[in-house]
Amino acid sequence: DIEMAKEGAKRMGKEIKLQPIDWDAKDMELEAGTIDCIWNGFTMNGREEDYTWTAPYMDNSQVVVTKADSGITTLEDLAGKIVEVQKESSAQSALEDKDHADLLASFKEFLMVDQYNTAFMDLESGAVDAIGIDIGVAKFQLQGKEEEFTILDEPISSEQYAVGFLKGNDELCDEVEKTLKEMEADGTFAKISDSYFGYDVSILGE
């Protein structure tokens, strides 16, 4: 996010100031004009009407990974299965959310490990049937293993990141979005993304 913001500001001919804030005070900061936008893995889902947003630039949905030959194709197929997540991860939070109470109750076992590397070893060995995980981490871990494992089409929860502005600040929002799309079109977004994630995380063109 920081590299993207720096590159975006440079292209727009603006000086950038990276301002850490108290997250609980973000709305006050925007309203007071002490910050112009929030560009920090800011989830737009559930907040669509609270801010003026750019188009979403990254998907951080929580998904399920299984072995390709497991026969598991939907979340309902996880009934009676052993599901593993990283302790204190977004996937754990999503599965423990009240919206997924029935899904969680259907598992044979719900296990937690300290690292996703351990979870993938457990999946590979057959110790567990599925892993709940961020889509970005899943795609990175599955590079070169696409025939062995699969990501279910149905996410546990959908989460997209966008740049958020004070409601009504359309002019600056539109300028930032235009610049983001230019960075996506000329490959800059992909280059920055690849240096951190090992692949292009952009969903701007979708």
Spans of model-derived segments:
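General small-molecule cofactor/ligand-binding pocket signal
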Residues: 17-19, 111, 152
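Alpha-to-beta junction loops
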Residues: 13-15, 31-40, 81-82, 115, ...
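Acidic, polar ligand-binding/catalytic clefts
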Residues: 2, 6, 10, 15-77
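A ligand-binding cleft/hinge motif common to bilobed small-molecule-binding domains
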Residues: 25, 41-50, 94-97, 122-158
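Extended ligand-binding regions for polar small-molecule ligands
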Residues: 2-11, 76, 81-82, 87-90, ...
